[in-house]
């Protein structure tokens, strides 16, 4: 489990660097609200972007984005709503997923913009 946690932290660090390199202003990482967590919150072009980061090893059977199921989406949206209210943010919100596959020489990164929308309640 420790190896998996280390890889996850390394993946989040790589995802953050990737976003900064591509013009995102990262506001917070690992922001907690109750038992929920937002991996990365950033702003780009007057839009608040909530980024879920998924890191996997090369030999993992499922693709990283498949781990973002309906339950996970609801938690991310609830935490994002709390974030917007807490910081009194008046920007449109976009939900992205950054996937990282660990290779021998580093990470293969895929950035999925508008990966999902907030479900209707």
Curated annotation (Swiss-Prot):
Xref: InterPro entries: Restrct_endonuc-II-like, tRNA_endonuc-like_dom_sf, UPF0102_YraN-like
Example GO molecular function: nucleic acid binding
Taxonomic superkingdom: Bacteria
PANTHER family given in the database record: UPF0102 PROTEIN YRAN (PTHR34039:SF1)
Family: Belongs to the UPF0102 family.
Protein known as: UPF0102 protein BDI_2565
Organism: Parabacteroides distasonis (strain ATCC 8503 / DSM 20701 / CIP 104284 / JCM 5825 / NCTC 11152)
